[in-house]
Every structure is written in C-alpha cells, then in structure tokens.
C-alpha cells in the first residue's frame, strides 16, 4: 500500500458482523462514526490543538460495503481559514477475495480549532504539493460560499414553494400520511461516547440519528431501507458525558425512489431533564432508497401533508432537494466519459432520426418533479442514476410554426440565450439538419467552452401538432478541439413546440445534462441563481417580438 501523503490520515477497518445490518451490509451509522473520527484526526494533525465538528456537507453513498470487506478512509485538510478548516474525506471498499476496490463516498466536513484557555487561534495555511491539491484548495472557497449562503437560499426557496402548491397537491391520489413514521429514542451519553476533549463524539450522534431515521423510513415502505445520502448539516451546540439525548425522526417527503427523513436532537442535563427543558443541538435530513426481493428500487407512495407542521416539513424537503441538486455539482467533481458520436455523412439519415427519437424519449420519461414556477415558466427536473435532466416549459404568445422557425435557426440563439456567445453553421447537411459550432462564455475564471452539434428539426406529422428541434454533440474531424476552448458536450437536448391555437403555443426545452454543461445550471438548480428563468423569459420575449430581418420569410 502506498504511504499516506503529508497531512493525510488513513483509517483501515475490516468489516465485522458487529458493524453490519441484518442484510450483512456495513451500517451507515458505523461508517459515519469512522468518517468523523478520521476527519477529526486530520484536522488536529494540521491545527496542533483539539478540534470539533462544525458542519458536514452532503454525503453521497455510491457503493455498499459488506461483512468481510475492508474499508479505507483517507482524510486531509484542503484549506484552512482563520479558525476553521475544510477536510476532504475519501472512502474506498476493497473485496479481499478479488482485490477489487470501489469508491464508496467523497465527502467534505468543516472543523473548528478549540483554543486552550483564552488563547487565540490562527491556523497556518495548507501546503499545496500537487496539482490536485491546488484544485481542491480553489474549490474549497466555492464550497464555503455555498455553505454560508445555505440558510438564505433555503428561506428564499421556502417563500417560493407556496406558489406551486396547487401543482403538487392536485395529483396526490393514493397519497399517504406520515404520522405512522414518527420515531423517538433516547440515549445516555457515557464516557465511551465522548471524544478525547469531553464533548459527545459528533460521529456517535450521527450514528444514533441514522438508526432512528432508518426505523422511520422502514415504517413507510415496510422493507429494508438503505442510506443514499445525508444532507448538509451543522452542529448547533455541544453535549457532554451525562447528557440525555432525545432523537425524534419522521418522514418529510418522498421523491419517486427516495424518501427524506428529518431527525431532531435535543440534549438535557439532569436539571433540564427534570424540568423538560432541552437544548436543540442538531437537525439532520437523511435520504433513503429501498429495494424489493429482486434488488429493484421501490417507488415510495406520495405524501399527503395534513397539519401545518406537515406542510412545513413537506415544503422544506422540496427546497432541500433543489439545493442538494445544485450543490451536488459544486461539491463533487466527477469526470465523465464523452458520449459523442462520430459524424458520418453516409449515416446522416439514421443519425438525424436517432437525434429526434432521443429527445422524444427524454420528454416521455416519467418522474419529472416541479422545482420552480413563475408566470409563464415552469421548471422540472429528473434524476436517474445520478444523471440530471431539466425541462423548462414556456407559454408563448406566438404561433407554433413561427416559434419553430425561430428556434431551429441556431445562429439566432445568441440573441436571447446568454449561454451562447456565438453559433456558426459548419454544414447544411439537408433542409432539416445542420451542423453548428457553438462558443460559450467564460465560467469560474476557466477557459470558455465550445461545442460541435447536430441540430435536427421536424414538422408535425399530419395528425400531430408538435414541432421538434433536437440537438446533440458530434465529433467532426474538420473542427478539432482548440486549445483556446474546453470542448464540451450536449448529450441530448432540444425543443418540443406544441400549438395551443393559431396564436399561441407551449415551448418545452429539454436537456439531459453532461458534466461539462452542468456548471452553467448548478446555481439555478440549487436556488441561488435565476439564470434558467431569466433565459426562458428572454426566449419568450424573442419569440413574441422576433427580429425583423427577413429571416422568417426566407428560412
């Protein structure tokens, strides 16, 4: 095994039956304890003083570990601020029979240094040795920005959520109440539960929270739920040996194959216990999946809120899901394998038809969730196997045939879409298929991105009234990647234009997101930007007041 890098702390654990659930899988609570321990020791290695967990970013679990396998956790400080540090944590699992290693999770937490007495702490900067160290150091500032604006973003989304309650509750046939999912449990903090400086161990609190949350989720599906992710949370206050910790859990909402469970933790010393006066020290939100006997994911029933508190928790889960969606692509940094196809003029007809069919299949998928609505615009998202798709629906006061002509000419796209700097025709393949080279604006001080795409348009069939404009990236030898740009990819995108009457239509824009395109949308999806709504409004304005340059009559 390679030696740990300077500043890195490594924990290796053989998974024993005592660490596992009834299914023989590593308990998520046990893993959270190990993660927190390793992160704390990495923080203290850098700070040289005792440290406590301040907050934990979203934790996504990509793989399940089982009895007999070995878990390896690596933690190191990515960036030190004045008194706090960001710790990156990487968790791997190895099968001892095959030697195969798989990624379980990449997570980030924040630790605060505890000064001795009244001494002020000013942490030394992190020594950056590799290119990856520099990347993580820069991303740490972005992640910190997201953490600091989390509360304001959440409150703004909660205010917005009431605008589309009708859209949500109109379709609640077969919905269920969450009252039967309420769970309460109590723990007495003993010396083995405390860390080496007297406070209740943060990882132990997380493990106890996970236990009650799992029970709550199981009462909704009557199956064995497994933890998929933990929402970002911060520790509100400390507890110590002798405290009684009361954990209360309840299902907040469901999203197709996911269920969110909220857990509240209150701490009581002896006097507070007698008086019934607790301290709220933590709230966390855990997201579960559940599988049937054939290991297929179960679709959870929709939730029907009844009380005022039910509605608050229901809306809160929707807001958190939206924030989580955007934050996921800031906090994680996944590379992807390009899916572009090579353009072959001899296969032009089949490539164009598959382009159109892919868009129609994306539009027909089930499980789209409303995330935003404003005046003439609705935004939906769909997550499948950690791949995100977006659907933007616009009501336009313009004939469908005119909208089709305007939107199918991509040279006009920069007039209304700020994500397009330029769009030039490479080749007119046919009357209904064109190849374009697109350039995009600079984002996050990086080089600008560019794209080579096939745009295929189709008029409605005789018995239909929907126009189609489909887009996907292709590889074209005549336009190779340029060092001036980062070559990016559109997997599947485009417009479906549905006529309402002779003077109005619904324009639906779909995009099956690639990692290279996501940064332009992450802020909007996360709730701290309005770029999608602003672009949609600009599109409506463009379609209702088209440029008078002879384009409409000649195209």
Swiss-Prot record:
Any Gene Ontology biological process: fatty acid metabolic process
SUPFAM superfamilies: Bet v1-like, Thioesterase/thiol ester dehydrase-isomerase
GO terms of molecular function: acetyl-CoA hydrolase activity; ATP binding; carboxylic ester hydrolase activity; identical protein binding; lipid binding
Pathway info: Lipid metabolism; fatty acid metabolism
HotDog ACOT-type domain: residues covered: 5-117, 179-294
Compartments it resides in: Cytoplasm, Cytosol
Coiled-coil intervals, chain numbering: none
PANTHER family xrefs: ACETYL-COENZYME A THIOESTERASE, ACYL COENZYME A THIOESTER HYDROLASE
Stated name of the protein: Acetyl-coenzyme A thioesterase
Taxonomic path: Eukaryota, Metazoa, Chordata, Craniata, Vertebrata
């Amino acid at each position: 095994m390679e030696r740990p890098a300077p500043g890195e702390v490594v924990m290796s654990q053989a998974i024993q039956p005592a660490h596992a659930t009834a299914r023989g899988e590593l308990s998520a609570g046990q893993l959270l304890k190990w993660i927190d321990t390793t992160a704390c020791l990495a923080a203290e290695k850098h700070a040289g003083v005792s440290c406590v967990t301040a907050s934990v970013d979203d934790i996504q679990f990509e793989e399940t570990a089982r009895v007999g396998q070995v878990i390896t956790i690596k933690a190191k400080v990515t960036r030190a601020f004045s008194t706090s540090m960001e710790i990156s944590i990487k968790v791997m699992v190895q099968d001892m029979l095959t030697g195969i290693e798989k990624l379980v999770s990449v997570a980030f937490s924040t630790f605060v240094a505890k000064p001795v007495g009244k001494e002020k702490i000013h942490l030394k900067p992190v020594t950056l040795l590799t290119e990856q160290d520099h990347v993580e150091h820069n991303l740490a500032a972005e992640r910190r920005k997201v953490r600091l604006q989390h509360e304001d973003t959440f409150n703004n989304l909660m205010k917005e959520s009431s605008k589309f309650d009708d859209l949500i509750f109109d379709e609640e046939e077969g919905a269920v109440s969450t009252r039967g999912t309420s769970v309460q449990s109590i723990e007495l903090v003993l010396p083995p539960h405390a860390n080496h400086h007297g406070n209740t161990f943060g990882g132990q609190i997380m493990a106890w929270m996970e236990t009650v949350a799992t029970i709550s989720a199981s009462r909704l599906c009557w199956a064995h739920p497994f933890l998929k992710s933990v929402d970002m949370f911060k520790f509100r206050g400390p507890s110590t040996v002798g405290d009684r910790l009361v954990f209360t859990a309840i299902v907040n909402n469901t999203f197709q194959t996911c269920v969110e469970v909220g857990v509240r933790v209150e701490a009581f010393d002896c006097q507070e216990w007698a008086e019934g006066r607790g301290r709220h020290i933590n709230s966390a939100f855990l997201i579960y999946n559940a599988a049937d006997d054939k290991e297929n994911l179960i679709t959870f029933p929709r939730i029907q809120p009844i009380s005022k508190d039910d509605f608050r928790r229901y809306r809160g889960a929707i807001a958190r899901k939206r924030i989580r969606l955007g934050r996921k692509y800031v906090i994680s940094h996944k590379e992807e394998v390009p899916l572009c196809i090579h353009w072959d003029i001899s296969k032009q007809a089949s490539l164009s038809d598959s382009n159109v069919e892919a868009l129609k299949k994306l539009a027909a998928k089930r499980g789209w969730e409303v995330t935003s609505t404003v005046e003439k615009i609705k935004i939906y998202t769909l997550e499948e196997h950690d791949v995100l798709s977006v659907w933007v629906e616009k009501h336009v006061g313009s004939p469908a045939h005119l909208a089709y002509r305007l939107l199918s000419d991509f040279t006009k796209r920069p007039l209304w879409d700020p994500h397009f700097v330029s769009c030039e025709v490479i080749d007119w393949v046919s009357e209904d298929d064109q190849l374009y080279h697109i350039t995009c604006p600079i984002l996050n001080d990086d080089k600008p991105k560019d794209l080579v795409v096939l745009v295929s348009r189709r008029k409605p069939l005789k018995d239909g009234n929907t126009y189609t404009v489909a887009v996907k990236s292709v590889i074209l030898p005549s336009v190779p990647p340029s060092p001036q740009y980062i070559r990016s990819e559109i997997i599947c995108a485009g417009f479906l234009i549905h006529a309402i009457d002779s003077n109005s239509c619904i324009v639906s824009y779909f995009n099956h997101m690639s990692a290279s395109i996501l940064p332009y949308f992450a802020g909007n999806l996360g709730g701290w930007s309005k770029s999608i709504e602003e672009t949609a409004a600009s599109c409506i304005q463009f379609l209702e007041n088209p440029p008078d340059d002879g384009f409409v009559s000649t195209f």
